């Protein structure tokens, strides 16, 4: 049995990552998942969070993904996400301003705005956390 599997991370705009990895940690609405090579086939939703994986060379990598879908089939995993960014591509000032806007909308908004603001707040916090890790 192989100890690696193929990971593809895809957004509507571009492919973010395409390569073999040893393991990945990601989050769905239930909690944190660890996926290793030869995992059973499955499909799950993902939430905005920091994804951690170890590439085939043993290097640990982290990136932010927004909500999406993760599919595992025949030792290949594809994550389809609205957006995904490695730390190098995150603008910390922009993320902090997005956080401030979301917090303000939470205080002012109606129920619909509140739900959107909560999601925007989660995205901005996860981006900030990732940027500050590196």
Curated annotation (Swiss-Prot):
GO molecular function: ATP binding; proton-transporting ATP synthase activity, rotational mechanism
GO CC field: plasma membrane; proton-transporting ATP synthase complex
SUPFAM superfamilies per UniProt: Epsilon subunit of F1F0-ATP synthase C-terminal domain, Epsilon subunit of F1F0-ATP synthase N-terminal domain
Function of the molecule: Produces ATP from ADP in the presence of a proton gradient across the membrane.
Family: Belongs to the ATPase epsilon chain family.
Record note on quaternary structure: F-type ATPases have 2 components, CF(1) - the catalytic core - and CF(0) - the membrane proton channel. CF(1) has five subunits: alpha(3), beta(3), gamma(1), delta(1), epsilon(1). CF(0) has three main subunits: a, b and c.
Protein name: ATP synthase epsilon chain
Lineage: Bacteria, Bacillati, Bacillota, Clostridia, Eubacteriales
